[in-house]
């Protein structure tokens, strides 16, 4: 029969091995997720600085503003699920998400101005604006501050 001390050492060893395997798998998953997100990213030079965004489709411009926990990829995925063809989906990464830096003034009004600057950079005069979850605040600010740029406002 093995002693209590030997059993505890074996248990700790097994826990350490299992933890190492979990960490290794987690690191692989994070690397794969970062690679997948960076593949579709574009950077637009705008009047307020470089902004990351993704774009898909053609037709009526639709600006899809993501919520918390995402980036342009979340905006693209949710908008694509909501609408069929016939839309040019433009999805920015909000301040502090993925490849868009946090400016000195990260307010919803400043974010709205950044959305308008992105539309300028992409030569889009007017767009349907979809604000998803936490993205709704800057979507509302965009409609309030740049109403001539918003053909419809949808909040989810």
What does each of the following model-derived ranges do?
Residues 110-128:
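Conserved acidic catalytic loop of the alpha/beta-hydrolase fold
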Residues 46-56:
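A short loop-to-beta-strand scaffold at the N-terminal edge of the catalytic core in hydrolase folds
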Residues 101-106:
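Short, solvent-exposed loop/turn segments at secondary-structure boundaries
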Residues 38, 84-86, 124, 147-148:
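Short, well-ordered coil/turn elements that cap or connect secondary structure elements
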Residues 54-99:
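Conserved HGGG/HGGXW glycine-rich cap/lid loop of the alpha/beta-hydrolase fold
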Residues 81, 118, 141-142:
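Hydrophobic/aromatic ligand-binding patch that stacks against planar heteroaromatic rings
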Residues 126-156:
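Conserved hydrolase catalytic core segment
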Residues 4-43:
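An N-terminal hydrophobic leader/cap segment in hydrolases
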